[in-house]
């Protein structure tokens, strides 16, 4: 994957990216809504290695002007060949600047135009207001609420379920 927007580049991971990934994935505030929790350096290296090549599900988001990795986009097959899930995690230094929306919008375009997808979904915890604001901003609608569906330690998290169809995106 290689997608360019006005300010961003979305590409495949390179091993050298692990340090930038570790910078934000080691932050408990960033990772509080991610079931895997806070990353160690080894977790960050494994994450980057796992997401290289044809089976990648996560892609770095690069700020073009600074050639700086500012977060990553999640994009993978959710159901059949026609439905993918999208998500995002960003370094707190680059949050609230429209980067997540810009990257997500580019992924929607890629999914619908290049991959001929029918549907793209996204999920988040109800407390993760910034994430579902991005979902709304890119045209997704809330389709559901799943009670206690994601295990996190000894707890269960609730989730909102958002989606957009190709015909709604156009």
From Swiss-Prot:
| Listed GO MF terms | acyltransferase activity, transferring groups other than amino-acyl groups
Q: Which residues form the N-acetyltransferase domain?
A: 8-167
Q: Which InterPro entries match?
A: Acyl_CoA_acyltransferase (IPR016181), GNAT_dom (IPR000182), N-acetyltransferase (IPR051531)
Name the keywords, alphabetized. Answer: Acyltransferase, Transferase
Enzyme Commission code(s) on record: 2.3.1.-
Q: Which domain of life is it from?
A: Bacteria
The UniProt family comment states: Belongs to the acetyltransferase family.
Q: What is this protein called?
A: Uncharacterized N-acetyltransferase YnaD
List the source organism.
Bacillus subtilis (strain 168)
Q: Which gene encodes it?
A: ynaD
């Amino acid at each position: 994957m290689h997608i360019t927007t006005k300010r961003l580049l979305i590409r495949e991971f390179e091993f050298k990216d692990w340090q930038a990934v570790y910078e934000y994935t080691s932050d408990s505030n960033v990772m509080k809504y991610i079931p895997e929790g806070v990353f160690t350096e080894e977790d960050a290296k494994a994450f980057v290695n796992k997401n290289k090549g044809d089976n990648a599900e996560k892609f770095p988001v690069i700020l073009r002007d600074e050639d700086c990795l500012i977060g990553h986009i999640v994009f993978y097959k959710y159901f059949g060949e026609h439905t993918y899930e999208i998500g995002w995690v960003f370094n707190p230094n680059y949050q609230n600047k429209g980067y997540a929306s810009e990257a997500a919008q580019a992924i929607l375009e890629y999914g619908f135009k290049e991959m001929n997808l029918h549907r793209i979904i996204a999920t988040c915890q109800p407390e993760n207001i910034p994430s579902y604001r991005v979902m709304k901003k890119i045209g997704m609608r809330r389709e559901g609420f799943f009670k206690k569906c994601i295990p996190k330690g000894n707890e269960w998290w609730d989730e909102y379920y958002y989606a957009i169809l190709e015909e709604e995106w156009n």
